[in-house]
Amino acid sequence: METPSQRRATRSGAQASSTPLSPTRITRLQEKEDLQELNDRLAVYIDRVRSLETENAGLRLRITESEEVVSREVSGIKSAYEAELGDARKTLDSVAKERARLQLELSKVREEFKELKARNTKKEGDLMAAQARLKDLEALLNSKEAALSTALSEKRTLEGELHDLRGQVAKLEAALGEAKKQLQDEMLRRVDAENRLQTLKEELDFQKNIYSEELRETKRRHETRLVEIDNGKQREFESRLADALQDLRAQHEDQVEQYKKELEKTYSAKLDNARQSAERNSNLVGAAHEELQQSRIRIDSLSAQLSQLQKQLAAKEAKLRDLEDSLARERDTSRRLLADKEREMAEMRARMQQQLDEYQELLDIKLALDMEIHAYRKLLEGEEERLRLSPSPTSQRSRGRASSHSSQTQSGGSVTKKRKLESSESRSSFSQHARTSGRVAVEEVDEEGKFVRLRNKSNEDQSMGNWQIKRQNGDDPLLTYRFPPKFTLKAGQVVTIWAAGAGATHSPPADLVWKSQNTWGCGNSLRTALINSTGEEVAMRKLVRSVTMIEDDEDEDGDDLLHHHHGSHGSSSGDPAEYNLRSRTVLCGTCGQPADKASASSSGAQVGGSISSGSSASSVTVTRSYRSVGGSGGGSFGDNLVTRSYLLGNSRPRTQSPQNCSIM
């Protein structure tokens, strides 16, 4: 369906296409079309305004009905507010009295704390003196043990030398016996040779006698034969016989002479050998006698030294036993004194901690009550302003007190606010991750970079020569510590590697000091790795710091609560039936048990609140729930529940065990 403007545009276009128009005609037609378009837009706007006026009339009727419903509920709500305001005034008076009592108790606790601190300082001085005396005695014991070990090593050395000398004496005695035996053998051989020489001489004489006898017998036979031979040949035979006898005699004499020379030569050689052997044996026997004499002299001197060392060792052992007994008595006395002082210090610390915890608990409760009263006052003032109620003289006086209290709280030099709250607070925590693949684990890493502690978790000793500990702190340079070459960590033992700036004493194998490094480093990401001699990572521990910033100002909390209250009014189109009620619940930060301090007296109002105290940053968390009444509801409260949390800081650390919990 075409609109009038579209039809007019169609007709004008047709006319323009049929007949040519002048510029003035064209201008008038355009103005006419503009006026027609504006008239159409005005008609549409008037229709829209009429429809909006109709809707506005319906809305005014609904608002009138809602105001009538709310006006019927104002009386009940006013009575509930007045009852709760009376309870708040009573609570404020009791809190003021409790505050005065707590201030008196705080002064007493401070005096007791000063006295206990002075006594603790004195006890710590006595403890330091006892520890210094114990260290001196331990140093004396170490020196005596070193002297004893030196004497024992010298004794073992002398015993070894004595054993060697005894072995040498035994060898020399054996050599002397062998030399004597050889001398006796040589003497026997000499006597045997002399006997043989005598025998040979006798045999030679006997042979000479035999030869002479044979010669005479031969002569006699020849003579007998010569007698028988005829006289013609006697001369020939005699000459031949003489020649033969001469030849035979010459041969016998040559043989005897040769045999005699050989016998004399053999005898002379054997006699020379026997004489040389006897001389050698006599020289060996003399040297053996001299060595034996020297060995006996040395053995006597070593025996005298050994007896003297044994006497010294016995005296040292007796003195060592006396020193050990005295050291044991000193240790027992020091242990008893140290145990007594530690028990007294523990009792004093327990009493101080208990008093501080009680004071901290009371201070937290008082702080929560002050916040609740301040929030009540802000809410009541807002409701009175919204409902245009005239405040009673009592409420004016309480408002005056509240304003004076807020001015005191807002003053920069207020001691109470400085004690209660800090402008901001940071809470840091460490998360650890450890990994172990060998016998030794990284048990503990100091957050301030003072030490690194390792533990041998196995049942066997672990040699850690040339092992390394590598420390990485974010993007900082890598720190590397190398163990001594002969270091060994016993089974189940712990070794602590201290930085030079920690002030620890170097006492291996339990405590080692890294003298070239003042600190292990501290930061937000600490990674400590244990590397063995082959370069393999056998253990690791990583610390990551997380920091939480807490903004906690009492006035800001009250203002936020008041702004939330007025914002609720604005969002509900100024509904006078909207209000906030709450109750309070105090929770113990350690054991988690609730302690009911107040309850809401309004029927149908269900409000939750909690106060918890953290153990690390000692921050108080106040959680409140608000139930708001809707504008279209009947005589009951609304169903919209709003929960808000407030963080209040306290710079004093607080640790409390469940046994000392004031709530339990």
Swiss-Prot record:
Site (Stutter): 325
GO molecular function, one term: structural constituent of cytoskeleton
Location of N6-acetyllysine modifications: 32, 78, 97, 108, 114, 123, 135, 144, 155, 171, 180, 201, 208, 233, 260, 265, 270, 311, 316, 341, 417, 450, 457, 486
Numbered residues of crosslink Glycyl lysine isopeptide (Lys-Gly) (interchain with G-Cter in SUMO): 201
Region (Head): 1-33
Subcellular localization: Nucleus lamina; Nucleus envelope; Nucleus, Nucleoplasm; Nucleus matrix
Modification type Phosphothreonine: residues: 3, 10, 19, 416, 496, 505, 548
Main location: nucleus
Keywords: Acetylation, Coiled coil, Glycoprotein, Intermediate filament, Isopeptide bond, Lipoprotein, Methylation, Nucleus, Phosphoprotein, Prenylation, Ubl conjugation
SMART domains found in the cross-reference section: Filament (SM01391)
Residues joined by cross-link Glycyl lysine isopeptide (Lys-Gly) (interchain with G-Cter in SUMO1): 597
Extent of Low complexity compositional bias: 403-414
UniProt modified residues of type N6-succinyllysine: 32, 171
N-acetylmethionine carried by residues: 1
Pfam families: Filament, LTD
Record site: Cleavage: 646-647
Residue numbers bearing the Cysteine methyl ester modification: 661
Ranges for domain IF rod: 31-387
Annotated region described as Interaction with MLIP, given as residue ranges: 1-130
LTD domain: residues covered: 428-545
Record note on modification: Proteolytic cleavage of the C-terminal of 18 residues of prelamin-A/C results in the production of lamin-A/C. The prelamin-A/C maturation pathway includes farnesylation of CAAX motif by protein farnesyltransferase (FNTA and FNTB), removal of the last three amino acids (-AAX) by RCE1/FACE2 and/or ZMPSTE24, methylation of the C-terminal cysteine by ICMT and endoproteolytic removal of the last 15 C-terminal amino acids by ZMPSTE24. Proteolytic cleavage requires prior farnesylation and methylation, and absence of these blocks cleavage.
Region spans: Linker 2: 219-242
Motif Nuclear localization signal, residue numbers: 417-422
Family: Belongs to the intermediate filament family.
Family annotation (PANTHER family): LAMIN DM0-RELATED, PRELAMIN-A_C
Name the record gives this protein: Prelamin-A/C
Gene that specifies this protein: LMNA
